[in-house]
Curated annotation (Swiss-Prot):
Testis- and sperm-specific. Keywords: Membrane. It comes from Mus musculus. The gene is Spa17. InterPro entries: cAMP_dep_PK_reg_su_I/II_a/b, DD_CABYR_SP17, IQ_motif_EF-hand-BS, Sp17. Residues 83-96 have a biased composition (Basic and acidic residues). This is Sperm surface protein Sp17.
Amino acid sequence: MSIPFSNTHYRIPQGFGNLLEGLTREILREQPDNIPAFAAAYFENLLEKREKTSFDPAEWGAKVEDRFYNNHAFKEQEQVEKCEQELAKSSGREETPVTPFEESTEEEREQEEAAALKIQSLFRGHVAREEVKKMKSDKNENLKEEADN
């Protein structure tokens, strides 16, 4: 933060910006009439959640911000796992398992090649018919113009 025409810069504590971003997001989402009361309730809820899950979004946000500048903050695998668990709990939806890509058999490849060949030949035939139609219409227009003259 800076003041116009001043060389003074205030340092915002790590994680504080993340907390304010979360509050702002919720205020914009909920559109409360009494913003200070809503903010107090939001921070109370955040404190309760932090006590129950031992996950601090401010600390996590500070580490994310720190990672942007130097990549040493996320060497702790334990914190990342906690974050992933918290996100999985809060999202409320289950992730679908990833199925590995299976190679197609020789028979499937032959069928795919035959289908591709058929599609290509049909498209080429379509383009050729359109060209013939265009040539016929141009020829008819030329004959009409000659007949009119």
